Amino acid sequence: MAWMIRDVPKDSRPRERLLSSGPESLSDHELIAILLRTGTKEESVVQLAQRLLRHFEGLRPLKDATVEEMTNIKGIGPTKAVQILAALELGRRIHQSGCADRYVIRCPEDGAKYVMEDMRFLSQEHFVAIYLNTKNQVIYRKTVFIGSLNASIVHPREVFKEAIKRSAASVICVHNHPSGDPTPSREDIDVTKRLAECGRIIGIELLDHLIIGDQKFISLKEKGYV
């Protein structure tokens, strides 16, 4: 018979602790244990949650796990895997929808905050354009391309076509460095200068080009390239 949360000592049960102290008081593995609900014949649900996190080396890799990868772990079937992935996806969508509600970008820090949680864990480079109105409110966001940044690939037409369509007053470009190091490359700088020049010609300003690393970023405007 599988171990369940009720089989854990009462003062250690995640559900009871959440009710008495709030969700913020629980550790990552305790929150996952609530989603899993049951353990295995050999271990409690809390122990299973701990093993799951150890296997993926924390929440960050777990966020990108597939159902197949999760079900390779003893004690994690399709139902448990789907429950965890659904919860992680809801968290991502809540964060995204909160930011998208006419988010105002007044400085590089605002822009980085808007995309950081979505982009800092990506395993490939994503080049994103954020379109703003005259009040610097976000009106649209588009992933222009996925792959290594190259001046021959990032064509200004693809960036500014959407800006014209959306009647945007300005645009902020963002891309991530999967290495976690946001230091700009020569290609990053060349692409930025090209986009800024095109923006000046058509009258839609490139406000900035942000490079996202792991919990850090660089503004190419602050570096003098815009």
From Swiss-Prot:
Record-linked PROSITE patterns: MPN (PS50249), UPF0758 (PS01302)
InterPro entries: MPN, RadC_JAB, RuvA_2-like, UPF0758, UPF0758_CS, UPF0758_N
Residues engaged in binding Zn(2+): 175, 177, 188
Domain of life: Bacteria
The keyword Secreted belongs to this UniProt entry's keyword annotation: no
Keywords from the named record: Hydrolase, Metal-binding, Metalloprotease, Protease, Zinc
GO biological processes: proteolysis
Residue runs in coiled coils: none
Pfam family, one: UPF0758_N
Motif (JAMM motif): 175-188
Stretches assigned to the MPN domain: 104-226
Gene Ontology MF: a single term: metal ion binding
PANTHER family from the UniProt entry: DNA REPAIR PROTEIN RADC (PTHR30471), UPF0758 PROTEIN YEES-RELATED (PTHR30471:SF3)
Family in the record: Belongs to the UPF0758 family.
Protein name: UPF0758 protein GK2618
Upper taxonomic lineage: Bacteria, Bacillati, Bacillota, Bacilli, Bacillales
